[in-house]
């Protein structure tokens, strides 16, 4: 009941903060994993811009943490009850959101973004090819290790934020497959899973440094893990010997990239994901033909290319 009340409050607050349109303007809520994360704020900014451009009411909804699975389910149920034109959602957990999305799709068109769920009911799905994102992470890590040590050889580790998240599982899959296929000299000595908190990533990274004196590289597969891993590298002064590739960006990780604490960032286009999610949902609500899958892309940004125009655009998106 408590989570339901919280979810209801979030729905109400988001609805009140949405821009005013004509009474007959369609409403398309967007439900993200975590409204406090910079990444998701960029997604919401894209959705907000689409709402203004297309004349759509876009309530911005989501729990306060990616681990609040029940909270997101309650928010989805409340959104469906409001009888919107469509709903855009990034599921927090692959298995747990499957049935709720199946049920929601019986009443309204569901557009998925970023992470999938155990459901075939999505009308369309927009995401980074996260398997490819993992491969890009492996390639970036191998290049950084080779630049430092002369060869892409040595011990490496993987840090994943939360278990059972479709996008993160796909990144891990791509990372491991790329290591096996292209970099036999890189040995995965640790495959760690956290609880979605940067402090946990900090502790995991610190423990890896202590337990693995020959560690040469780490792939931290989302923003929060990159924050924590980068902090541990900075505190232990290991940037020269341990190369870390993160995933996604914010002010903290961009600073880490600029000063060499992080060797690179695999960066998505979350603004496009939010914008095109609303655009696709509106088209679907009108019965227009839409793509069932859209790859929104990912790019490796390093210190060497971070000042290029496209890199600047991705690293410094406008969220207001």
What are the functions of these language-model segments?
Residues 7-15:
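Bacterial N-terminal signal peptides
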Residues 3-5, 21-320:
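A residue-level marker of the well-folded mature domains of exported/periplasmic proteins
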Residues 17-19:
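N-terminal signal peptide c-region/cleavage motif recognized by signal peptidases
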